[in-house]
Amino acid sequence: MTEKRAKFTKMMDGDAEDYSIIAASNADDYNHLADKVLDHLRMLENDYGGFQVDRLTHSLQTATRAYRDGRDDEYVVCALIHDIGDNLAPANHAEFAATILQPFVSEENYWIVKHHGIFQGYYFFEFLGLDKNMRDKYADEPYFESCREFCEKYDQNSFDPNYDTLDLDFFIPMVKELFQKPKRSIYLQS
């Protein structure tokens, strides 16, 4: 069976039937979105970036620490994929991950993921000739303390090859649940 496709070659020539076909196809994308996110997360395996553990293990360890600390599933998934952009968007990995998460998570969790790169810099920027207190420019933001805590409790300490890290299979149900349906999007009617 051939997939239904719009008739137009220029969007300005599309009609209601065309956009109905496209909307149905886009809605079906959510059935596979979690699997795509997980596939990309798996691409971090064996990518050490100079650390003692690979980037996938770091991500799993960050999520494991958040889970064991009693964080809710949304927060744990944010911890899991906070560095998903490390190998595709190394110059802005935090923003990359935050953009993926934004339609599905709270404003606070989005802000944490978006800014964790700068907040994580507190632990190493000085060794690169950068200002370790760069995060202080956000001191008056409502989620400053949440992001600081995320980096301190879960992110900066998750490079331990001896830590009892949960495997990816443990987190798959949480990822699938989170990415089922966006909470907000320009494509959703209010």
Residue spans of the language-model regions?
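Metal-dependent phosphohydrolase cores
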Residues: 1-80, 84-190
